[in-house]
Amino acid sequence: MRRVISVLSLAVLCLLCTACGWTKPVPLPEEDAISEAPALTRDLPVAEALQRGAVQSILVIGDSISDGNTDDGCVWGQDEREALGCRLILTEENGNRYYENAPDSQGWVKFLRAQAEAAGASVFHNDAISGMSAKWFNAHKELLFTEQDRYDAIFVMLGTNDRTACQTGEEFRAEYGELLAYVAARCEYLTVLVPIPAIYTPTDTVKNMNSAEIAENVRTLCGEAGYDFIDCYKDFPQMAADLGLPLGSLYWGGTHPNAVGYRTLWTAIAHEPEGTAQPEDFASVTCIGCNRDDLSGETAPDAMDASGDPLYPLGVSWYYTWNTFTPALPYGAFLETHRETDGSTVQYARSNKYQPSEFSLVRRWENGGWTDWADND
């Protein structure tokens, strides 16, 4: 069966760098991509206020998803951001300094910024910091209001990193609830965004909760406190399905969206999905990691890892690597493997790991070995 990924006819489709260097990659005209993005039209007070130009100042609080991590295929360090003249977000007690990402690399936030500025907003601060949790932000919440003591609108998307920062859902709700109460008192419109699913969990990191548990805790917290919220955990996969985009094609490494993923996320934020297609059951797909030392292009489908578990589990699995996988894939690939109970295995490869595109290659496990890669037509 031909595995094909539909491609959005969007100007945001561009060539992304595969390794970060000092020179920023040059995408297709960013202004055109942003100008074509949908406006925030959800049935929310903040959307109506934005449309009538009543929002002059906006603050975004979040982690790497709101920072725009890998939006341009790169992860920009704090020293690089400082050298580029990016805005200083805050300075931690230990002297660590955190800077905004470049404005055109801020993922879904850049689309919100464009709409707000077009409507007359004069202040837009993105205080998202990669790797940080709601628990961390709660401990540093006063530092978010050093430039000004309140904003017209505040958007918050946190929780993904609380899978490790917090031990239980109760602890997470307590920390996040305290942060949101503090923030809500300093704005006219507070909008909470339920974080998107992290479909790849590194095996070397212990998670006390999964993405679904985080999402349910955020919903509960917002429901009890009466906060407006957008359920990106549900709406992002649904929007992907409506647009004909497999969910795995919208991630870079399974945790952070790629450029088209961020565009799809913003579309899901801007307006509710129509629900015209069945959303992908990403929970049924096993993400087996990234750049594993024990997995190569010659690995047999029934090979075991050090714990005695199959490297390729039964069913569908996803694997990412930017190292050489086979001679036909010298720069790595995004791989989807279908392993059946009868031992038959088919593997599809997409050499462009950062953008939705066709699974252009296919191979099969036959007679104790992998066939050569062939065109998937």
Stretches with model-predicted labels:
Residues 28-126, 143-148:
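Serine-esterase "nucleophile elbow" of acetyl-processing enzymes
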Residues 21-27:
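Bacterial lipoprotein signal-peptidase II cleavage site
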Residues 281-361, 365-377:
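Glycine-rich, flexible loop motifs
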Residues 67-74, 129, 133-173, 196-199:
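Oxyanion-hole/transition-state-stabilizing segment in secreted/luminal serine hydrolases
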Residues 155-161, 180-216:
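Active-site segments of SGNH/GDSL-like serine hydrolases
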Residues 16-19:
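C-terminal motif of bacterial Sec signal peptides marking the signal peptidase cleavage site
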Residues 198-281:
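Catalytic His-Asp segment of secreted/periplasmic serine-dependent ester chemistry enzymes
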Residues 57-67, 123-128, 152-158, 190-195, ...:
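Structural recognition of the beta-strand scaffold that forms the well-ordered cores
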